[in-house]
UniProtKB/Swiss-Prot annotation:
SUPFAM superfamilies documented for this protein: Plexin repeat (SSF103575), Sema domain (SSF101912)
GO terms, molecular function: chemorepellent activity; semaphorin receptor binding
UniProt protein name: Semaphorin-1A
InterPro entries membership: Plexin_repeat (IPR002165), PSI (IPR016201), SEM1A_sema_dom (IPR042068), Semap_dom (IPR001627), Semap_dom_sf (IPR036352), Semaphorin (IPR027231), WD40/YVTN_repeat-like_dom_sf (IPR015943)
Organism annotation: Schistocerca americana (American grasshopper)
Subcellular location: Membrane
Domain Sema: 28-490
Glycosylation sites noted in the Swiss-Prot or TrEMBL record: 44, 71, 163, 267, 360, 539
Length: 730
């Protein structure tokens, strides 16, 4: 019994701790958009465009696509057709592409790189039917004219789906891509400098996700096969690498190689004795500057996932630029022999000047420093997460995180500021979240998921996100897939479902506050927002305010958002190639859920964007949290254990029989009689004979005596003479 209780207690402890880790933070609001609420740009509707956001130019976006660069207005996502740039591959290049085994869709010119050289000139690079080319265009008389054309190998990928990045800084293009048709020669390039060819210690099958400049450095974020783990198996780690802007290459034979290339691991993990790692970086934000726990820091937010053959896990981690720079000033990591462990290099073995640093002229560096940095590009210390743990974790078999965009330091009426995170998934969703403890602490995480928005059709991944800040309340989030570009508002504070102060404050949305004068939920763009907390009620940290009359008493939960709507709206002037399989049954659906563990659940039917109530099309399903299910399971186990123990005890008492004394062997009977009062005789050392009513057995022969007929009881029925057996031997 004791062992069983110990086992159940251990099960309870493990279940509660597991539930505490895997319990996803529930969104406060679910939103599914209809046609009237979404601005959409479709581009080429007959073929896949492979849209890629390339540049923001004042109030327009430059988007790379199939044979075209679109210039799209940020106001309404309409195209400035007079500024469109078309660039098709030549017939000879397409024929050569076909001979290499590629399809017609592959053998097009997908624009992947664009950089503004000055106000009237741009640099554009495209895949050009798997033979990359670059061009300089100049704006003359309202039209773009080609100034020059040159090979784009090392600047642009061959495949439009390849994970490549590029940035233009101080008149130089820095690219991270592949330099061959098969994609087996990855490189970080700025002519004429590149990383080492076929050196797994520098780049080992990388997937680049972002490039940015900071001070005198260019930073590259990517994931790759970990060379330091290769003796134990195969694993993918997330990396941040840097090069110096003014690196001129090394002396002599190192003239076309980086002398400042270093890389570190990014550590996004759930802390503990055995941390759980999210090893594969998918996207990063730009550098965000803000106030965190009273300190001004510059952060980068990143999206990380588990491997595709692991559990479906995604996380968002933040890293400070200070920690990244410190990791590059720390010890190097090396493997002395092929079978040795990767260990930190002792400081006495590091030459002077320290390898990897930015110098005035890298061509004057001694050979020992250049050789050292060539073979010791990996740093020993990983870059830790800023808040000591992930800001948001999602464990889901339905989707993984793909992209992130951040609206930095959104001000609230009480003077605080929060970074609002917009996270795209591979299932067409956008999750809006924040760390409500970020203003008060730099080492605490209190995750809040404000909204979960089904922006794209289910199964269509979000390829890019971009926050557009405009005057007034016209700011928006641009969502990009391969085939369409959409723009949505950053908030839904004015929804007619938010009817009172408690519901507005419980959203914990920095964009929204309750207006005590107008008695409605007001957005951040309100002209009176500067009145502050004297007029507006908001509490991002707790999600409740005493001015609202206490804690909310009910939870407003709508039916599950349909994932495969089948009805198709009519009269829509534009249609996506996915539109036939994804048309919402209602124009707009918003579901508000107050996240409170002590509330009484209630339901609310779907409401369209005009505010009219519609009957619910689905039966409302109860919602159970992980804690509730865990408690129910453990309680059932304990109950079953107690009932089983009591039943077994009663059954054993009922079925217990009388003592069995008629044993077949005399020594066993003597042993029992010796222990009884009648058989005990202290004066005699011998056991008294026991009475036996049965006939005596001859112990010598072990047979009973003959019967009345003179025959032994065990003898055969007839006594016949024994005949000799005749044997014949052959």
């Amino acid at each position: 019994m004791r062992a069983a209780l110990v086992a159940v207690a251990a099960l309870l402890w493990v279940a509660l701790h597991a539930a505490a880790w895997v319990n996803d933070v529930s969104p406060k609001m679910y939103v599914q958009f209809g046609e009237e609420r979404v601005q959409r740009f479709l581009g080429n509707e007959s073929h896949k465009d492979h849209f890629k956001l390339l540049e923001k130019d004042h109030n327009s976006l430059l988007v790379g696509a199939r044979n075209i660069v679109y210039n799209i207005s940020l106001r309404d996502l309409t195209e400035f057709t007079e500024q469109r740039i078309e660039w098709h591959s030549s017939g000879a290049h397409r024929e050569l592409c076909y001979l290499k085994g590629k399809s017609e869709d592959d053998c097009q010119n997908y624009i992947r790189v664009l950089a503004k050289i000055d106000d009237d000139r741009v640099l554009i690079c495209g895949t050009n039917a798997y033979k990359p080319l670059c061009r300089h265009y100049a704006l003359k008389d309202g039209d773009y004219v080609v100034e020059k054309e040159y090979e784009g190998r090392g600047l642009c990928p061959f495949d439009p789906d390849h994970n490549s990045t590029a940035i233009y800084s101080e008149g130089q293009l820095y690219s991270a891509t592949v330099a061959d048709f098969s994609g087996t020669d990855p490189l970080i390039y700025r002519g004429p400098l590149r990383t080492e060819r076929s050196d797994l210690k520098q780049l080992n099958a990388p997937n680049f996700v972002n490039t940015m400049e900071y001070n005198d450095f260019i930073f590259f974020f990517f994931r790759e096969t970990a060379v330091e783990y290769i003796n134990c198996g195969k694993a993918i780690y997330s990396r941040v690498a840097r090069v110096c802007k003014h690196d001129k290459g090394g002396p002599h034979q190192f003239g076309d190689r980086w002398t400042s290339f270093l890389k570190s691991r990014l550590n996004c993990s759930v802390p503990g004795d055995y941390p759980f790692y999210f090893n594969e970086i998918q996207s990063t934000s730009d550098i965000i500057e803000g106030n965190y726990g009273g300190q001004v820091e510059k952060l980068i937010y990143g999206v990380f996932t588990t491997p595709v053959n692991s559990i479906g896990g995604s996380a968002v981690c933040a890293f400070s630029m200070k920690s990244i720079l410190e990791s590059f000033d720390g010890p190097f990591k090396e493997q002395e022999t092929m079978n040795s462990n990767w260990l930190a290099v002792p400081s006495l073995k590091v030459p002077e000047p320290r390898p990897g640093q930015c110098v005035n002229d890298s061509r004057t560096l001694p050979d020992v420093s250049v050789n050292f940095v060539k073979s010791h590009t990996l740093m020993d210390e990983a870059v830790p997460a800023f808040f000591t743990r992930p800001i948001l974790i999602r464990i889901s078999l339905q989707y993984r995180f793909t992209k992130i965009a951040v609206d930095q330091q959104v001000r609230t009426p009480d003077g605080k500021a929060y970074d609002v995170l917009f996270i795209g998934t591979d299932d067409g969703k956008v999750i809006k979240a924040l760390n409500s403890a970020s203003f008060d602490s730099s080492d605490t995480v209190d995750s809040v998921v404000i909204e979960e928005l089904q922006v794209l059709p289910p199964g269509v991944p979000v390829k890019n996100l971009y926050v557009v800040r405009m005057d007034g309340d016209d700011s928006k989030l641009v969502v990009v897939s391969d085939d369409e570009i959409l723009a949505i508002k950053l908030h839904r504070c004015g929804s007619d479902k938010i009817t009172n102060c408690r519901e507005c404050v419980s959203l914990q949305d920095p964009y929204c506050a309750w207006d005590n004068v107008e008695l409605k939920c007001t957005a951040v763009g309100s002209p009176d927002w500067s009145a502050g907390k004297r007029r507006f009620i908001q509490n991002i940290s707790l999600g409740e305010h005493k001015a609202c009359g206490g804690r909310p008493q009910t939870e407003i939960v709508a039916s599950p958002v349909p994932t495969q709507p089948t009805t198709k709206s009519s009269g829509d002037p534009v249609h996506s190639i996915h539109q036939a399989e994804f048309e919402p049954e209602i124009d707009n659906e918003i579901v508000i859920g107050v996240d409170d563990s002590n509330v009484i659940p209630n339901t609310l039917a779907e409401i369209n964007h005009a505010g009219s109530k519609l009957p619910s099309s689905q039966e409302k399903l109860p919602i159970y949290t992980a804690e509730t299910l865990t408690i129910a399971i453990v309680t059932s186990c304990l109950g079953a254990l107690v009932v089983g123990f009591i039943s077994g005890f009663l059954f054993s008492r009922r079925c217990r029989g009388e003592d069995y004394t008629d044993m077949p062997f005399p020594d066993q009977r003597h042993q029992l009689n010796r222990l009884t009062e009648a058989g005990l005789n202290a004066d005699s050392p011998y056991l008294p004979p026991c009475a036996n009513n049965k006939a005596a057995i001859n112990l010598v022969l072990n047979v009973p005596p003959k019967n009345a007929n003179g025959k032994n009881a065990n003898s055969s029925a007839e006594n016949k003479p024994i005949q000799k057996v005749k044997k014949t031997y052959i």
